[in-house]
Amino acid sequence: MRESLFIIFFQFVCHSSNSLGVTLGSTFFRPVPLLTWTAPSIDLALSILALFFSCKCCCCWSSRRSRDLFFGKDSVVLLLLQLLSLENTFKWPAAVVDAAIPLLCFKLVSVSFNGDLIIIFVGETIFFFLF
């Protein structure tokens, strides 16, 4: 079930467009040191993933290209499927945590909520969620 939800999200990000006609782009996550991987970072990452899975449609836009993150040997698809299959998020194996840091450890810049639209700015990436 979780794998199916993520595949739907991946198709949204890479191949679809939302009801407002905005083409969905890919995301870019900047690698950060292991020491910054904290419980609040995990909570924020999981919250953003929860938004992806519960919204009607989503859009991610970044000023940098990230094609390799989706199709490389350490692709987003494979890593996130691994993460979503683990029950206890605070006891992830070290290797999985190391691989996930560039993908899930965010520095939240600002959040804007307007009716059914939530906009989150994370570094150079902007996330749009329509409910």
From Swiss-Prot:
Subcellular localization(s) per the UniProt record: Membrane
Q: Does the keyword Ion transport apply?
A: no
- Lipid bilayer topology: Multi-pass membrane protein
Report if keyword Transmembrane is assigned: yes
Keyword terms: Membrane, Signal, Transmembrane, Transmembrane helix
* Signal peptide, first to last residue: 1-19
TM segments?
Answer: 33-53, 111-131
Q: Name one GO cellular component term.
A: membrane
Miscellaneous note, as given in the UniProt record, is:
Partially overlaps DBF4.
| Protein's name according to its UniProt entry | Putative uncharacterized protein YDR053W
The major lineage groups are: Eukaryota, Fungi, Dikarya, Ascomycota, Saccharomycotina
